[in-house]
Amino acid sequence: GAKFTLFIPSNYHNKFPLSDHKDWIDWLKSKGYFELAAHGHYHMCERNDIGECEFFEIDTEDKAKSRIWQMMDEWSDVDHKPIGWRNPGWLAHPEAVKWLGPIFKYAAIHKEHNHNMEWACKTFYGHDGIHETDISFHDGNIMFQSHIAGDWNDNVWNKENYEQLKVSLAYLLKSYDIKFSTIAELL
């Protein structure tokens, strides 16, 4: 069956700290087909002009270290140390990347939005939404991505996107030798 890497903000919009939902994290970890990875702390910005690209506005060493500490502290409170990272909103400031890279074993990033930045960890490229029909291989891998909910993204889990992903997976399984894995299992 399929496996999933769930990129989870550690305190989404400053309303849902992981430490208040340890039972959910424990349940996800118990399943065996989820990898839990980091996806920012707040997944929101102080600026109004860059969407939710939280780590794009983190432009100093002090800001980067402080936000990373807040994020990893929440993860520690649920007894989990994520080894993977994805930028909220795909973008990150070079100063943030400098401090994120050594914390994680890998970063799952968008090739174009990364702007050729060097990471101090392994990088995996992939950005195909569950709703898309033009699927891309990156270094022999396919990485579907989605959002659980929200009306600002096309790649949310609704019936139409679920049906499209089923069609895409059926085609890929028929056409290629596919092995489902989490990103951590690719290391």
Model segments located where?
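Metal-dependent polysaccharide deacetylase catalytic core of the NodB/CE4 family, i.e.
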Residues: 2-94, 146-152
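C-terminal domain-boundary segment and adjacent tail
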Residues: 4, 8, 105-111, 148-187
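Active-site glycine- and acidic-residue-rich loops that bind
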Residues: 14-17, 124-128, 153-162
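Short amphipathic alpha-helices and their capping/turn segments at secondary-structure boundaries
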Residues: 18-32, 131-137, 168-172
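Non-transmembrane alpha-helical segments in soluble domains
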Residues: 25-26, 72, 97-101, 166-173
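His/Asp/Glu-enriched short active-site or ligand-binding loop at hydrolase and phosphoryl-transfer sites
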Residues: 97-133, 180-182
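Charged, low-complexity C-terminal accessory regions
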Residues: 121-151
